[in-house]
Every structure is written in C-alpha cells, then in structure tokens.
C-alpha cells in the first residue's frame, strides 16, 4: 500500500510546516501546498490498514527535504522534521511489524536535492569541488541564472528540474554513499525493503 506521507494523515499538528492547510480545505491543492501529513498520522491508521488486509507499506520519500513530495532529498540520513523524527519512524516500523506489515522506503537514488551539502559544494567550489564527479555536469559554473530553457541546464537533472541534479551512479563514491544510506536504514531501523 503506497503512502504519500504529506497527504495521508496529520497525527501531530505541532510539527506541521508553517502555513499548512486544513485537511478539509476546499481548494484545489498545488504542488507547493502542505497539509501536514506525518509519520504519527500513519501510525494512527495502522489498525485501519490492517483491517483492509494490507501487508506492506511503501512510503514515498521521508527524508529531509524542503518540498512536500520530498523527492529532492537534502539528507538521506535524517527524517524530515515535518514528518517526525527517527524515534517516530522506529515506532512506525515496530508497530507495523507487530501487525504483520512490511515497511519499504522509496529509494530516490537517481538524483538529490539542490540544497544538499554535496550539490551546494559544487555550486560554491565549481570545478574544485570534491563532489563534481558525483553529478553529470556539462559545464561550470552550474548556475541557472537567466536560463530561458530548462533543457539547457549545465547539468543533468531529473525532469529538467534544476532543484533535482542527477547523481552519477557509476561513480564508486556515489555507489558507496548510497549503499551506506540503504544499509543504515536496514540495520538501524529494521526496514524490510527499498
């Protein structure tokens, strides 16, 4: 059962993003809107999901990110603060397992967020960046200022969106980093799959 956490259920309004909309809003949601869904909201509905016969939960990205969709990750080792924290995630995994449900995380390893430390190092240091080979860069600087056509980005990006630079997954350093991420969540939180 796939869950988009930001829109599933708000179990802890205290951690909702500033300006989060009410759940019963009659507006047509925009891609920039937040409603405050979180991990506690999922925990609160585990009995309901179990009653439906659900045996696995596939969570869209839950990692630190400024967007509502979280596909532009800034830190793969942190839960986004608007979703909760590592202890609330641990609680979700444990309670799901008690109900016979598996937990799968969305492995967004094709690209990373432009606010990630790795990409920001490339922006700041250009060709001298220790991370320049982590990405598919055509030319320096990697600025998008005055860019008339997204297809002319000086680097490859997911969906030509400048805030999601593509990772060079052939690079051994990138592979090692992503394997550390995957291993961390399995070993520390007992997730079942990516």
List the predicted regions and their residue ranges.
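Substrate-binding/active-site clefts of carbohydrate-active enzymes
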Residues: 5-55, 62-190
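Phosphate-binding beta-loop-alpha motif at adenosine-nucleotide cofactor sites
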Residues: 192-194
């Amino acid at each position: 059962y796939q869950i988009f956490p930001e829109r599933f259920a708000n179990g802890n309004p205290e951690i909702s993003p500033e300006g989060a909309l009410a759940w019963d809003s009659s507006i047509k949601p925009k891609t920039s809107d937040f409603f405050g869904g979180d991990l506690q909201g999922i925990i609160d509905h585990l009995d309901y999901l179990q009653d439906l016969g659900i045996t696995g939960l596939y969570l869209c990205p839950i990692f630190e990110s400024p967007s509502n969709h979280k596909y532009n990750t800034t830190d793969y080792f942190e839960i986004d603060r608007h979703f909760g924290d590592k202890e609330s995630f641990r609680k979700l995994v444990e309670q799901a397992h008690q109900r016979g449900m598996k937990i799968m995380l969305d492995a967004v390893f094709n690209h990373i967020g432009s606010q990630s430390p790795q990409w920001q190092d490339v922006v700041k240091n250009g060709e001298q960046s220790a991370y320049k080979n982590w990405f598919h860069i055509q030319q320096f600087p990697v600025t998008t200022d005055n860019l008339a056509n997204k297809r002319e980005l000086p680097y490859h990006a997911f969906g030509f969106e400048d805030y999601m630079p593509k990772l060079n997954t052939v690079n051994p350093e990138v592979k090692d980093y992503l394997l550390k991420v995957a291993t961390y969540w399995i070993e520390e939180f007992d997730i079942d799959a990516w």
